[in-house]
Amino acid sequence: MDALTVHRLHFAFTVTFHYIFPQLTMGLALLILILMGTYLAEYRLRLEPASGAGRLVWWMHTAALLIFLPVIVRTKHLHLLLAPVTIFLSRGGFSRIPPLVGEEDFGLVTGSDSTRLVALQAFSCVECGRCQEHCPAYNTGKILNPKEIALGLRSYFKAHGAGSEEPLLGEYLSEEAIFQCTTCGACEYQCPVGIEHLPLLVGLRRGAVNTGQWEDAHGGELFLRLERNGNPLGMSALERDKFIKRAELPLYDGTQEYLLWLGCMGAYDPAGRESLLALTRVMRYLGVSWGVLKKEKCTGDAARRLGNDLVFQQLAEFNIGQLQAVRARKLISICPHCVRTIGEDWKQAGASFEIEHHSVFLARHDAKLPAPGTRERTVYHDPCYLGRYLETYDEPRAVVAGAAELIEVARRRERSFCCGAGGGLAFLGEEKGTRVSRERAVELAATEAGTVAAACPFCHTMLRDGLAAVRPLNAPQIVDIAQLAAARLPRTPGARNDDSK
C-alpha cells in the first residue's frame, strides 16, 4: 500500500468520523474510549488471550491504537509526542531570555526568526488553560491570553511555515496583548508541558521595539529617561547624591563586607528609601560593614523586559564598570528585580556578581535581633521576582514571623498573584480593565490583617495604591520586611527618621 493510498484512507476515516461523530472531535474521543475500554475490560474481566472475547478485545485495542497514531499528528493531541521533547529541550532555569545573536538579530519579527524550540513549543500546547487561569492580565480584563500566544504561533506556522517572512504580529498575534504581560511567570510555572511563554513574549517585544513598530508614548518616554537620567523615574542623579549625603551612607571602598545596591526605588522613591534605611539600621545593629556606589544607574530590568536590548546593554555596561572599578565582591539589594537582573541577565553582558536579596540576609540574622514587643497580624505578599524567579519563599516569611503574627493569603508562594508592576508595566500608563494591583489588594484586604508586608519596592508602591482604592477609610498599612525587622531594634537617642525625604 503506497503512501498516497494511506493518506487517502486516513483522510476518508477522518472525514467520516467528523460527520458521523461531530461531538467527539473527529472521532478522537471514541478512539480513546475504545483504547481505555478494551484495556480496562481485559484487566477487570481477566479475559484469556486465547478465548474469543480475549481475541476480540485485543483486535479492537490494536485497531484503535493503529488508527490513533496517524490521526494524532493532525490534532491537538500531538502534544503527547512533542511535550516530552519540549521539556527535554527547554533552556533550563526559569524564564531565561536568550541573547540576541549578531547585529541583524532584532528578536521575533517574522517566522524566519523563530527557532525550532519556538515552533516545537507552539505545537506542544495542551490547550488546558492553566496558564490563562493564573495570568493577571487575562484575569483583569486585558486581551492578553498566554494560551492564545502559543496557539497564535501554531496557527501562523500552519498558515505560513516556520521560514516565512510574513510578520508574526498582526493576524495571529496582537501587539497590544504582548505589551500587557507583567512577566510575572505564572503562566510558565503552571504549564504542564514546559512552554516558555516569557522568552516568547520578550522576543516578540524585541521585534516590535527594534523595528520601530511599537509606538507607545509612555514606552518611548521611559527609554529616554533611562538613557538620559539613568533611571526610569526621570530623576537627576544629584537627587541620589543628596540622599546619600543626608542619610550618611558610606561609600564602598572595597574593604566592606557588602556593597549595598540602592536601585532606582531605593535611591529616588520615598517609600523605597524608607525600606533601604530600615535595612541599613539592621546592618549597623548587627555590626555588618557595607557601603554604596558613588555612581549607579538602573540595572536595565524594565528595558530588558520591554524588549529594548540596546538601552539594557548600555546600562549594564556602565554599572558593571562601576562595580569592577571598586572590586565589589558581594552585593545586597531590597529589590528582587535588581537581584534577578544583576545575578542572571548581566551574565550575558560578560559579568558575574554574587548578590542576595535582603530577605535572605535578614532571615539569616533573625535570631540576633531583639524579640518584638507586640505581634500585629501581618499578611505577606510574595513578589513574583522573589518567589517564582528566585525561589525565595521561606526567608521573608521567617522575617515576618519574627516580628509579627504571620497571616497567609489564599494565593501565595508559587501561585502568588502579581502586583502589576513587572515587565516595565509600572511605567506604561493606565491599564485597561481592572488594575492588577487592585485585584491583589482585594485578596490581601480580605485577610483582615492590619499590616501588609512586602519584600519588593515595586510591590510596595503598587499595593499601597491598590489598598487605598479598595479600602479608602481603613486601608491596612503596608511596610517592607526590613521595616518589620528594624522595628524590633531598641530606639537610640538622636536616631534619624526623616532621611528618606
Task: Give the residues covered by each predicted segment.
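Polytopic transmembrane helical bundles with strong interfacial aromatic enrichment
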Residues: 1-39, 50
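Short helix-terminus and kink motifs of transmembrane alpha helices
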Residues: 28, 32, 36, 75-83, ...
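Membrane-embedded alpha-helical bundles of multi-pass integral membrane proteins
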Residues: 37-109, 113-116
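Short, charged low-complexity linear segments at domain edges
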Residues: 90-117, 151-171, 393-402, 421-433
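Non-transmembrane accessory domains of multi-pass membrane transporters/channels
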Residues: 95-146, 183
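Iron-sulfur-cluster electron-transfer modules
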Residues: 113-116, 122, 148-150, 157-341, ...
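Cofactor-cradling patches in redox/metallo enzymes
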Residues: 262-357, 385-401, 405-501
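Hydrophobic alpha-helical positions that pack around
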Residues: 380
